[in-house]
Amino acid sequence: MPKKFQGENTKSAVARARKAEAKAVSDGKRQKEIEDAYWQDDDKHVARKGQRKEDKEKKRLEQLERKKESQRLLDEEDSKMKAKPTKPAAPSKVTRAEIEETLCKEEEHKATTEKPKTHLEMPLEENVNRRVLEEGEVEARTVEDAIAALSVGKELDRHPERRMKAAFAAFEEINMPLLKQENPNMRLSQLKHLLKKEWMKSPENPMNQQHAMYNSH
């Protein structure tokens, strides 16, 4: 009986060859996909990087343009301000009351400066033949001198208002500090009102002196 052929089966070899070829094709295709994906990712990265750079440059140019526009507006406004003539300052308004007050002060000053001095305001020349003592006594060499001295005293008593201003000033100088010390919480107007009330009943008031003199007669 003859031996069987020990060689390779042709069909099996063909199948294996086809399988190996299919595997090689599949592996090559997969490798190509991997490489394509790699290069595609790299392209995307490059594209994103380029886009970021482009956006950054665009923002820089926009900021530069805005700065230029702002500077242009400032320069334009500055030119307008320099070209515009400055208006003179408007004079401050004066009220009618202020005008009247100024006129009254001027009239008072004029009346004070132009007012002729009376015999009471004129300095008295010393008369060796007649002098009035502090106690109110009159020293005279003759009867005529005594009558003249008494006449002057009567003239002063007849017009006490002429001595009011000086007497009140002296009264205020002495008593105002005392009132301030006694009433530290009062305003100046209140202190002056209180001082006036004290003055009206003070024996230093020439008007009160006149009444006292009349009552003594």
Curated annotation (Swiss-Prot):
InterPro entries, per the entry: Ccdc124/Oxs1, Ccdc124/Oxs1_C
GO molecular function: transcription coactivator activity
Compartments where found: Cytoplasm, Cytoskeleton, Microtubule organizing center, Centrosome; Midbody
Main localization of the protein described in the UniProt heading: cytoplasm
GO biological process terms on file: cell division; transcription by RNA polymerase II
Region listing for Disordered, in residue ranges: 1-128
Biased composition (Basic and acidic residues): 18-45, 52-74, 95-128
GO CC annotation, single: centrosome
Keyword entries, A-Z: Cell cycle, Cell division, Coiled coil, Cytoplasm, Cytoskeleton
Regions annotated as coiled coil: 46-82
Top-level lineage group: Eukaryota
Cited PANTHER family: COILED-COIL DOMAIN-CONTAINING PROTEIN 124
Subunit structure as annotated in this protein's UniProt entry: Associates with translationally inactive ribosomes in the nonrotated state.
Family statement: Belongs to the CCDC124 family.
Role of this protein: Ribosome-binding protein involved in ribosome hibernation: associates with translationally inactive ribosomes and stabilizes the nonrotated conformation of the 80S ribosome, thereby promoting ribosome preservation and storage.
Name of the protein in question: Coiled-coil domain-containing protein 124-A
Originating species: Xenopus laevis
